[in-house]
């Protein structure tokens, strides 16, 4: 009989995107509850130990975070299993490094270094807008923020640029055809392209057709589309490969070309 929340996560049940080896133990760090879903997050422990190699084991990560050296979205986080997720800015002030968590085309969180200037803001997808107590309008974002008194032109599925220090909206991007977007779920996870059109299916899932910079067209659900730029101009820097998914043959040719040079 299950009593209360689960406290463990087996290695084999952990998200593939964490890229943990099967034989490295029985368990994986179970992310704490937080602004991102368990399967769409990356615990700080894996980020510092497995990705950045700043620690050899979990105990060392705990020592690092307990020195209050790690900030996520401008707030010090001392929980080694804090779930950092898509678009979060991780700051290590001691080394002067800034990272933004974004997906690569294989659907994994990529360690994407950014400048101090870019680390001052993040993009958030608007989940819903509504009226709160006393008729105060507010919107809810994909990372659990509630922002009051937004611009009345902002609606669900748009993206807002949030200043991390103040939590205020500095700019917004409408969900429109021709705008740049990144896919945050499904088999096209991590791909970047421009919105071609949106098929409305009342009572079901709206389908969005997207075209990448190579001219490939693919479709996904509206819930997986995250607007990241106006026209072809992204508001954030993109990781290596610019979100273009190569076919298996193209990947092979690229590898062979790299070997011959």
From Swiss-Prot:
- Ribonucleoprotein as a keyword of this entry, yes or no, is yes
Q: Which GO terms describe its molecular function?
A: RNA binding; rRNA binding; structural constituent of ribosome
S4 RNA-binding domain boundaries = 42-104
- Give me any GO biological process, just one: translation
Assigned GO CC terms: cytosolic ribosome; cytosolic small ribosomal subunit
Domain of life according to the entry: Eukaryota
User: Which UniProt keywords are present, listed alphabetically?
Assistant: Ribonucleoprotein, Ribosomal protein, RNA-binding, rRNA-binding
Pfam families, sorted: 40S_S4_C (PF16121), KOW (PF00467), Ribosomal_S4e (PF00900), RS4NT (PF08071), S4 (PF01479)
**Do you know which InterPro entries this protein is assigned to?**
KOW, Rib_uL2_dom2, Ribosomal_eS4, Ribosomal_eS4_C, Ribosomal_eS4_central_region, Ribosomal_eS4_central_sf, Ribosomal_eS4_KOW, Ribosomal_eS4_N
Q: Which family does it belong to?
A: Belongs to the eukaryotic ribosomal protein eS4 family.
Give the matching HAMAP family. Ribosomal_eS4
Record-given protein name: Small ribosomal subunit protein eS4
Q: Which organism is it from?
A: Drosophila melanogaster
